[in-house]
């Protein structure tokens, strides 16, 4: 594997820490008035999402991870695995529940996703930023039954539950922000 010095470490770079891929979220090069320079960095493990802060000497090296982000299309789920296809090469890969990283509740089929591959194996799936899903179950909203802004839970066709405004009804299609899991708009 390739290694890079601490002078070449940048935000967004993917590295290996204890044989696990991580992405650097923050770096700060510190040169104190007395003593040796060092780099303080924060990184997030791709698989678990755990964030760790580490300080390293300027002479240390880090190992670059063989991690590739690939645009792929979600095809289907067979209950145990989720299947994706590269639209250019038609190569198919599958991942389990751990590799989905919570993206499974936003995918119904034929969505374009970013799949992170490590040594050819999917370890993380990023769904599209916005998805349009149909509401399968929600209570009818009655005007005046709230003391604040109001909202009600709605179950979507994928099984996800989001809070929606009172004017949204069952069988309507809504736009959901997958990054926050919040209602965005009603689709006409």
UniProtKB/Swiss-Prot annotation:
Can you summarize the PTM annotation of this record?
Answer: May be beta-lysylated on the epsilon-amino group of Lys-34 by the combined action of EpmA and EpmB, and then hydroxylated on the C5 position of the same residue by EpmC (if this protein is present). Lysylation is critical for the stimulatory effect of EF-P on peptide-bond formation. The lysylation moiety may extend toward the peptidyltransferase center and stabilize the terminal 3-CCA end of the tRNA. Hydroxylation of the C5 position on Lys-34 may allow additional potential stabilizing hydrogen-bond interactions with the P-tRNA.
Name of the gene this protein is made from:
efp
Its UniProt pathway annotation is:
Protein biosynthesis; polypeptide chain elongation
In its UniProt entry, what is this protein called? Elongation factor P
Pfam families cross-referenced by the UniProt entry? EFP, EFP_N, Elong-fact-P_C
Sorted alphabetically, the keyword list is:
Cytoplasm, Elongation factor, Hydroxylation, Protein biosynthesis
Q: What is its main location?
A: cytoplasm
Which NCBIfam families has this protein been placed in?
efp, PRK00529.1
Under the heading Gene3D superfamilies, the entry gives: 2.30.30.30, Nucleic acid-binding proteins (2.40.50.140)
Q: Which InterPro entries match?
A: Elong-fact-P_C, NA-bd_OB-fold, Rib_uL2_dom2, Transl_elong_fac_P/YeiP, Transl_elong_KOW-like, Transl_elong_P/YeiP_cen, Transl_elong_P/YeiP_CS, Transl_elongation_fac_P
């Amino acid at each position: 594997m390739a290694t890079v010095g601490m002078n070449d470490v940048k935000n967004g770079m993917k590295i290996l820490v204890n044989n696990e891929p991580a992405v650097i979220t923050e770096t700060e090069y510190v040169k104190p008035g007395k003593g040796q320079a060092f780099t303080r960095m924060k990184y997030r493990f791709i698989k678990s999402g755990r964030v760790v802060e580490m300080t390293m000497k300027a002479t240390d090296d880090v190992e670059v991870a063989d991690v590739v982000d690939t645009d792929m299309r979600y095809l289907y789920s067979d209950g145990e695995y989720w299947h994706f296809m590269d639209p250019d090469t038609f190569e198919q890969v599958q991942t389990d529940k751990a590799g989905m990283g919570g993206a499974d509740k936003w995918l119904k089929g034929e969505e374009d996703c970013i799949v992170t591959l490590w040594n050819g194996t999917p370890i993380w799936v990023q769904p599209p930023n916005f998805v349009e899903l149909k509401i399968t179950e929600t209570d009818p909203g009655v005007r005046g039954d709230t003391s604040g802004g109001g909202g009600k839970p709605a179950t979507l066709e994928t099984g996800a539950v989001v809070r929606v405004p009172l004017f949204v009804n069952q069988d309507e299609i809504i736009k959901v922000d997958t990054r926050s899991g919040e209602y965005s708009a009603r689709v006409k």
